[in-house]
């Protein structure tokens, strides 16, 4: 058995597709009416559809998990993030951990936590 995809719930699937394309270069693999699979295995699920499956509330900014990306030129990434999405909500501005890795954490458009760090 292997992990196939990671699914995140989004309010506006088209805005989210653009967000992940703009920042991370993810392209559309499959559009299945409220469910989009992007390259790298990320799945965007329309919130209304997801709620109908689970019959549970969606809790944005729950901070219980994160999407983790690595970027060699993190300063360039931060510049792109600030230019394309100037109102993005940061959890941690660009910082350096005690082990030397530089990271930034922020929420996507729907409160899903994202971390971008330099390669370890």
Label for each model-derived stretch:
Residues 14-26:
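Amphipathic alpha-helical segments
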Residues 25-30, 87-91:
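Short secondary-structure junctions
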Residues 27-61, 113-118:
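Conserved short beta-strand elements that form part of the metal-binding/catalytic scaffold
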């Amino acid at each position: 058995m292997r992990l196939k995809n990671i699914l995140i719930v989004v309010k506006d699937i088209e805005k989210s597709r653009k967000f992940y394309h703009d920042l991370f270069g993810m392209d559309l693999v499959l559009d299945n009416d409220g469910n989009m699979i992007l390259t790298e295995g990320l799945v965007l699920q329309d919130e209304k559809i997801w709620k109908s499956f689970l019959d549970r509330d969606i809790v944005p900014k729950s901070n219980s998990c994160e999407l983790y990306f690595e970027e060699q030129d993190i300063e360039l990434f931060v510049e792109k993030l600030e230019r394309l999405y100037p109102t993005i909500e940061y959890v941690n501005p660009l910082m350096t951990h005690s082990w030397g890795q530089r990271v930034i954490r922020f929420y996507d458009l729907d409160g899903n936590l994202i971390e971008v760090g330099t390669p370890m």
